[in-house]
Protein backbone atom coordinates (compact mmCIF):
# COMPACT_ATOMS: atom_id res chain seq x y z
CA UNK A 1 0.00 0.00 0.00
CA UNK A 2 1.39 3.42 -0.97
CA UNK A 3 2.33 5.75 1.86
CA UNK A 4 0.68 9.11 1.06
CA UNK A 5 0.99 12.31 3.05
CA UNK A 6 -2.56 13.61 2.83
CA UNK A 7 -3.27 17.31 2.37
CA UNK A 8 -5.36 19.30 4.82
CA UNK A 9 -5.42 22.53 2.80
CA UNK A 10 -4.96 23.91 -0.71
CA UNK A 11 -3.29 27.10 -1.92
CA UNK A 12 -5.27 29.08 -4.50
CA UNK A 13 -2.80 30.72 -6.92
CA UNK A 14 -5.44 33.14 -8.21
CA UNK A 15 -6.19 34.39 -11.71
CA UNK A 16 -3.38 33.38 -14.12
CA UNK A 17 -1.02 36.11 -15.39
CA UNK A 18 -2.30 38.82 -13.03
CA UNK A 19 0.64 39.09 -10.60
CA UNK A 20 1.03 42.67 -9.35
CA UNK A 21 -2.59 43.57 -10.14
CA UNK A 22 -4.03 42.38 -6.83
CA UNK A 23 -5.10 45.83 -5.56
CA UNK A 24 -6.77 46.78 -8.85
CA UNK A 25 -8.56 43.42 -9.05
CA UNK A 26 -9.70 43.75 -5.43
CA UNK A 27 -11.32 47.16 -6.13
CA UNK A 28 -12.95 45.96 -9.38
CA UNK A 29 -14.37 42.73 -7.91
CA UNK A 30 -15.50 44.44 -4.71
CA UNK A 31 -17.40 47.00 -6.81
CA UNK A 32 -19.02 44.29 -8.98
CA UNK A 33 -19.91 42.09 -5.99
CA UNK A 34 -21.42 45.01 -4.05
CA UNK A 35 -23.64 46.07 -6.97
CA UNK A 36 -24.60 42.44 -7.64
CA UNK A 37 -25.91 42.08 -4.08
CA UNK A 38 -27.51 45.55 -4.10
CA UNK A 39 -29.21 45.21 -7.50
CA UNK A 40 -30.59 41.73 -6.93
CA UNK A 41 -31.74 42.48 -3.38
CA UNK A 42 -33.64 45.52 -4.71
CA UNK A 43 -35.33 43.42 -7.41
CA UNK A 44 -36.27 40.77 -4.84
CA UNK A 45 -37.65 43.47 -2.50
CA UNK A 46 -39.60 45.05 -5.37
CA UNK A 47 -41.21 41.70 -6.27
CA UNK A 48 -42.06 40.83 -2.66
CA UNK A 49 -43.51 44.28 -1.88
CA UNK A 50 -45.68 44.65 -5.01
CA UNK A 51 -48.87 42.55 -5.15
CA UNK A 52 -49.11 43.11 -8.93
CA UNK A 53 -45.87 41.14 -9.33
CA UNK A 54 -47.14 38.08 -7.46
CA UNK A 55 -47.39 36.00 -10.65
CA UNK A 56 -45.50 32.89 -11.84
CA UNK A 57 -43.16 34.96 -14.04
CA UNK A 58 -42.06 37.18 -11.15
CA UNK A 59 -41.96 34.27 -8.72
CA UNK A 60 -39.22 32.75 -10.90
CA UNK A 61 -37.54 36.15 -11.36
CA UNK A 62 -37.44 36.61 -7.58
CA UNK A 63 -35.78 33.21 -7.21
CA UNK A 64 -33.30 34.11 -9.96
CA UNK A 65 -32.39 37.25 -7.97
CA UNK A 66 -31.70 35.08 -4.91
CA UNK A 67 -29.51 32.73 -6.95
CA UNK A 68 -27.69 35.72 -8.45
CA UNK A 69 -26.76 36.76 -4.91
CA UNK A 70 -25.77 33.27 -3.74
CA UNK A 71 -23.85 32.07 -6.83
CA UNK A 72 -21.06 34.72 -6.78
CA UNK A 73 -20.95 34.46 -2.97
CA UNK A 74 -19.43 30.97 -3.34
CA UNK A 75 -16.20 32.31 -4.87
CA UNK A 76 -16.08 36.11 -4.54
CA UNK A 77 -15.64 36.60 -0.74
CA UNK A 78 -12.70 34.18 -0.63
CA UNK A 79 -11.16 35.79 -3.72
CA UNK A 80 -11.53 39.27 -2.19
CA UNK A 81 -9.98 37.99 1.04
CA UNK A 82 -6.82 36.63 -0.57
CA UNK A 83 -6.52 39.65 -2.89
CA UNK A 84 -6.58 42.00 0.13
CA UNK A 85 -4.53 40.13 2.76
CA UNK A 86 -2.60 37.80 0.42
CA UNK A 87 -3.79 34.70 2.29
CA UNK A 88 -4.66 32.18 -0.45
CA UNK A 89 -5.03 29.07 1.74
CA UNK A 90 -8.34 27.17 1.77
CA UNK A 91 -9.02 24.09 3.90
CA UNK A 92 -9.65 20.68 2.34
CA UNK A 93 -13.29 20.74 3.50
CA UNK A 94 -13.62 24.37 2.39
CA UNK A 95 -12.40 23.42 -1.08
CA UNK A 96 -14.91 20.56 -1.28
CA UNK A 97 -17.72 22.86 -0.09
CA UNK A 98 -16.76 25.51 -2.65
CA UNK A 99 -16.85 23.00 -5.50
CA UNK A 100 -20.16 21.52 -4.32
CA UNK A 101 -22.02 24.83 -3.91
CA UNK A 102 -20.57 26.28 -7.12
CA UNK A 103 -22.01 23.41 -9.16
CA UNK A 104 -25.21 23.16 -7.08
CA UNK A 105 -26.11 26.82 -7.54
CA UNK A 106 -24.80 27.06 -11.11
CA UNK A 107 -26.71 24.02 -12.39
CA UNK A 108 -29.88 24.89 -10.43
CA UNK A 109 -29.81 28.40 -11.91
CA UNK A 110 -29.38 26.84 -15.36
CA UNK A 111 -32.49 24.72 -14.70
CA UNK A 112 -34.31 27.85 -13.56
CA UNK A 113 -33.55 29.54 -16.90
CA UNK A 114 -35.20 26.57 -18.63
CA UNK A 115 -38.22 26.80 -16.32
CA UNK A 116 -38.52 30.53 -17.04
CA UNK A 117 -38.35 29.85 -20.79
CA UNK A 118 -41.18 27.30 -20.40
CA UNK A 119 -43.16 29.88 -18.39
CA UNK A 120 -42.81 32.41 -21.25
CA UNK A 121 -43.82 29.69 -23.74
CA UNK A 122 -47.04 28.99 -21.83
CA UNK A 123 -47.77 32.73 -21.40
CA UNK A 124 -47.43 33.49 -25.14
CA UNK A 125 -48.59 30.26 -26.78
CA UNK A 126 -51.41 29.44 -24.31
CA UNK A 127 -52.36 32.83 -22.78
CA UNK A 128 -55.95 31.87 -21.90
CA UNK A 129 -54.80 28.80 -19.95
CA UNK A 130 -51.66 30.38 -18.47
CA UNK A 131 -52.83 30.69 -14.86
CA UNK A 132 -54.46 27.25 -15.05
CA UNK A 133 -51.25 25.58 -16.28
CA UNK A 134 -48.81 27.57 -14.13
CA UNK A 135 -50.61 26.99 -10.83
CA UNK A 136 -48.68 27.66 -7.58
CA UNK A 137 -48.22 23.92 -7.03
CA UNK A 138 -46.77 23.48 -10.52
CA UNK A 139 -44.38 26.43 -10.03
CA UNK A 140 -43.13 25.06 -6.70
CA UNK A 141 -42.75 21.55 -8.20
CA UNK A 142 -40.65 22.92 -11.09
CA UNK A 143 -38.37 24.72 -8.62
CA UNK A 144 -38.00 21.57 -6.48
CA UNK A 145 -37.07 19.55 -9.59
CA UNK A 146 -34.48 22.22 -10.48
CA UNK A 147 -33.00 21.95 -6.97
CA UNK A 148 -32.91 18.14 -7.13
CA UNK A 149 -31.16 18.17 -10.53
CA UNK A 150 -28.61 20.68 -9.20
CA UNK A 151 -28.07 18.68 -6.01
CA UNK A 152 -27.56 15.40 -7.91
CA UNK A 153 -25.17 17.06 -10.37
CA UNK A 154 -23.09 18.68 -7.60
CA UNK A 155 -23.05 15.52 -5.45
CA UNK A 156 -21.75 13.37 -8.32
CA UNK A 157 -18.96 15.81 -9.19
CA UNK A 158 -17.91 16.49 -5.58
CA UNK A 159 -17.93 12.83 -4.50
CA UNK A 160 -15.91 11.75 -7.56
CA UNK A 161 -13.39 14.55 -7.02
CA UNK A 162 -12.85 14.14 -3.29
CA UNK A 163 -12.85 10.35 -3.11
CA UNK A 164 -9.41 10.64 -4.74
CA UNK A 165 -6.23 10.92 -2.65
CA UNK A 166 -4.46 14.30 -2.72
CA UNK A 167 -0.82 14.56 -1.67
CA UNK A 168 2.45 16.33 -2.57
CA UNK A 169 1.55 19.60 -4.35
CA UNK A 170 -1.38 21.53 -2.89
CA UNK A 171 -1.22 24.51 -5.27
CA UNK A 172 -4.47 25.02 -7.18
CA UNK A 173 -3.64 27.03 -10.31
CA UNK A 174 -6.94 28.92 -10.25
CA UNK A 175 -8.94 31.42 -8.20
CA UNK A 176 -11.34 28.83 -6.73
CA UNK A 177 -11.70 25.05 -6.36
CA UNK A 178 -13.10 23.66 -9.61
CA UNK A 179 -12.67 20.26 -11.24
CA UNK A 180 -10.08 21.14 -13.94
CA UNK A 181 -7.87 22.87 -11.35
CA UNK A 182 -8.16 20.33 -8.50
CA UNK A 183 -8.05 16.97 -10.32
CA UNK A 184 -4.43 17.34 -11.61
CA UNK A 185 -3.28 17.37 -7.95
CA UNK A 186 -4.64 13.86 -7.28
CA UNK A 187 -2.09 11.14 -6.51
CA UNK A 188 -4.49 8.40 -7.63
CA UNK A 189 -5.99 7.84 -11.08
CA UNK A 190 -8.41 10.66 -11.91
CA UNK A 191 -9.46 9.50 -15.41
CA UNK A 192 -12.92 8.36 -14.29
CA UNK A 193 -13.58 11.64 -12.44
CA UNK A 194 -12.44 13.67 -15.47
CA UNK A 195 -14.55 11.66 -17.91
CA UNK A 196 -17.72 11.60 -15.79
CA UNK A 197 -17.26 15.28 -14.93
CA UNK A 198 -16.96 16.32 -18.59
CA UNK A 199 -19.93 14.17 -19.64
CA UNK A 200 -22.05 15.35 -16.71
CA UNK A 201 -21.35 19.07 -17.21
CA UNK A 202 -21.59 18.87 -21.02
CA UNK A 203 -24.79 16.80 -21.08
CA UNK A 204 -26.57 18.99 -18.52
CA UNK A 205 -25.56 22.23 -20.28
CA UNK A 206 -26.67 20.90 -23.69
CA UNK A 207 -30.00 19.60 -22.35
CA UNK A 208 -30.80 22.89 -20.63
CA UNK A 209 -29.79 24.94 -23.67
CA UNK A 210 -31.84 22.64 -25.91
CA UNK A 211 -34.93 23.05 -23.70
CA UNK A 212 -34.55 26.85 -23.82
CA UNK A 213 -34.17 26.76 -27.62
CA UNK A 214 -37.29 24.57 -28.03
CA UNK A 215 -39.34 26.99 -25.90
CA UNK A 216 -38.12 30.03 -27.82
CA UNK A 217 -38.66 28.43 -31.24
CA UNK A 218 -42.33 27.92 -30.29
CA UNK A 219 -42.45 31.47 -28.91
CA UNK A 220 -40.93 32.87 -32.13
CA UNK A 221 -43.47 31.03 -34.29
CA UNK A 222 -46.33 32.27 -32.07
CA UNK A 223 -45.07 35.89 -32.24
CA UNK A 224 -44.84 35.75 -36.06
CA UNK A 225 -48.50 34.65 -36.19
CA UNK A 226 -49.64 37.75 -34.28
CA UNK A 227 -51.09 40.14 -36.85
CA UNK A 228 -50.73 43.49 -35.10
CA UNK A 229 -47.30 45.09 -34.72
CA UNK A 230 -48.28 46.25 -31.23
CA UNK A 231 -49.16 42.69 -30.21
CA UNK A 232 -45.85 41.36 -31.54
CA UNK A 233 -43.95 44.11 -29.71
CA UNK A 234 -45.74 43.36 -26.43
CA UNK A 235 -45.12 39.60 -26.73
CA UNK A 236 -41.45 40.12 -27.60
CA UNK A 237 -40.89 42.61 -24.77
CA UNK A 238 -42.01 40.03 -22.18
CA UNK A 239 -39.24 37.69 -23.38
CA UNK A 240 -36.43 40.09 -24.31
CA UNK A 241 -35.05 40.54 -20.78
CA UNK A 242 -35.03 36.79 -20.12
CA UNK A 243 -33.45 36.04 -23.51
CA UNK A 244 -30.73 38.65 -22.89
CA UNK A 245 -30.00 37.12 -19.46
CA UNK A 246 -29.72 33.64 -21.01
CA UNK A 247 -27.24 34.91 -23.63
CA UNK A 248 -25.15 36.51 -20.85
CA UNK A 249 -25.19 33.25 -18.87
CA UNK A 250 -24.57 30.76 -21.69
CA UNK A 251 -22.34 32.97 -23.87
CA UNK A 252 -19.20 32.63 -21.70
CA UNK A 253 -19.76 28.87 -21.28
CA UNK A 254 -20.09 28.38 -25.06
CA UNK A 255 -16.89 30.38 -25.63
CA UNK A 256 -14.87 28.21 -23.24
CA UNK A 257 -16.16 24.94 -24.75
CA UNK A 258 -15.38 26.09 -28.32
CA UNK A 259 -11.68 26.49 -27.51
CA UNK A 260 -9.48 24.10 -29.46
CA UNK A 261 -6.67 24.35 -26.90
CA UNK A 262 -7.42 25.32 -23.27
CA UNK A 263 -6.18 28.78 -22.29
CA UNK A 264 -5.91 29.26 -18.48
CA UNK A 265 -6.30 33.05 -18.67
CA UNK A 266 -9.28 32.87 -21.05
CA UNK A 267 -10.82 30.14 -18.88
CA UNK A 268 -10.50 32.35 -15.79
CA UNK A 269 -11.95 35.39 -17.60
CA UNK A 270 -14.92 33.31 -18.81
CA UNK A 271 -15.53 31.91 -15.32
CA UNK A 272 -15.45 35.45 -13.89
CA UNK A 273 -17.95 36.61 -16.52
CA UNK A 274 -20.22 33.66 -15.75
CA UNK A 275 -19.87 33.64 -11.97
CA UNK A 276 -19.46 37.31 -11.02
CA UNK A 277 -20.32 39.66 -13.90
CA UNK A 278 -23.41 37.86 -15.28
CA UNK A 279 -25.35 37.99 -11.94
CA UNK A 280 -24.74 41.76 -11.81
CA UNK A 281 -25.88 42.19 -15.43
CA UNK A 282 -29.09 40.25 -14.73
CA UNK A 283 -30.20 42.86 -12.20
CA UNK A 284 -29.46 45.65 -14.71
CA UNK A 285 -31.23 43.82 -17.55
CA UNK A 286 -34.43 43.17 -15.62
CA UNK A 287 -34.52 46.62 -14.01
CA UNK A 288 -33.95 48.45 -17.32
CA UNK A 289 -36.00 46.30 -19.72
CA UNK A 290 -39.02 45.39 -17.58
CA UNK A 291 -41.60 48.16 -17.05
CA UNK A 292 -43.34 46.43 -14.13
CA UNK A 293 -40.05 45.91 -12.27
CA UNK A 294 -39.02 49.54 -12.94
CA UNK A 295 -42.37 50.76 -11.60
CA UNK A 296 -42.07 48.63 -8.47
CA UNK A 297 -38.44 49.70 -7.92
CA UNK A 298 -39.55 53.34 -8.12
CA UNK A 299 -42.07 52.68 -5.32
CA UNK A 300 -39.35 50.98 -3.23
CA UNK A 301 -37.06 54.01 -3.61
CA UNK A 302 -39.94 56.37 -2.79
CA UNK A 303 -40.67 54.41 0.40
CA UNK A 304 -36.99 54.45 1.38
CA UNK A 305 -36.82 58.23 0.77
CA UNK A 306 -40.07 58.83 2.68
CA UNK A 307 -38.93 56.82 5.73
CA UNK A 308 -35.49 58.45 5.55
CA UNK A 309 -37.03 61.92 5.80
CA UNK A 310 -39.08 61.07 8.89
Curated annotation (Swiss-Prot):
Q: What are the glycosylated positions?
A: 3
Primary localization = membrane
Q: Which domain of life is it from?
A: Eukaryota
Q: What Gene Ontology terms describe what this protein does at the molecular function level?
A: G protein-coupled receptor activity; olfactory receptor activity
Name which cysteines form disulfide bonds. 95-187
User: Ranges in the Extracellular compartment?
Assistant: 1-23, 77-95, 158-202, 259-264
PROSITE patterns attached to this UniProt entry: G_PROTEIN_RECEP_F1_2 (PS50262)
CDD domains, sorted: 7tmA_OR10D-like (cd15228)
Q: Which SUPFAM superfamilies match?
A: Family A G protein-coupled receptor-like
**Gene Ontology CC terms, in alphabetical order:** membrane; plasma membrane
The transmembrane residues are: 24-44, 56-76, 96-116, 137-157, 203-223, 238-258, 265-285
Localization per record: Cell membrane
Q: What does this protein do?
A: Odorant receptor.
Q: What is this protein called?
A: Olfactory receptor 10N1
Q: Which gene encodes it?
A: Or10n1
Amino acid sequence: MDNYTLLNEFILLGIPQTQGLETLLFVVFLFIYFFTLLGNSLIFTAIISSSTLHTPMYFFLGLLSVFDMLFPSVTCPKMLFYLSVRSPAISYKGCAAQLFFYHLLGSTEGCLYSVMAYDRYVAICHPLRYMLIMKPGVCVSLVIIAWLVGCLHATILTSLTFQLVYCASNQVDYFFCDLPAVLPLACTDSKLARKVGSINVGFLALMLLFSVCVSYVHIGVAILRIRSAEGRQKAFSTCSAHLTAILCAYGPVIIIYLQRTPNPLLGAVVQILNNIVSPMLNSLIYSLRNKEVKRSLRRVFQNITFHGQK
